[in-house]
C-alpha cells in the first residue's frame, strides 16, 4: 500500500447544498493521505482522506475560519474520471458541523468540475 502525505494549497469555489442553496469562496492549506494504484497508461485508482483549515473571502460566510475533513475517491481510465465521489465535514467557528456530499469529473493532472449534492 502506497501512502503519500501531501500538503495542498487549494481554492474551493463550490455550490453548497444546505437547507438553502448558496456558494462559498474559500481557500486554505491542508494535509492529505492518499492511496494510489497506478496501472499505467493513465489508468489508476485513488482514495484520499484529508484535513484543511479554511478562510472565506466573505468574512460573514459560515465557512470563514472553519476546518474540514474530506474522504473520497476516483478511478482514472485513460487519464479521465467521471466517478469522483466523497463527503466532507466542515467544523464551523461557532462549533456547528456541516456535511457535504460531492461528485466530480475531469482529467488527471488538471482542474476538474464538481457538484455538491444533498444527502
Spans of model-derived segments:
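Hydrophobic h-region of N-terminal signal peptides that target proteins for export
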Residues: 10-18
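Beta-strand-enriched cores of mature, soluble protein domains
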Residues: 19-119
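Sec-dependent signal peptide recognition
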Residues: 2-10
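Intrinsically disordered, low-complexity Ser/Thr- and Pro-rich stretches
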Residues: 1-2, 18
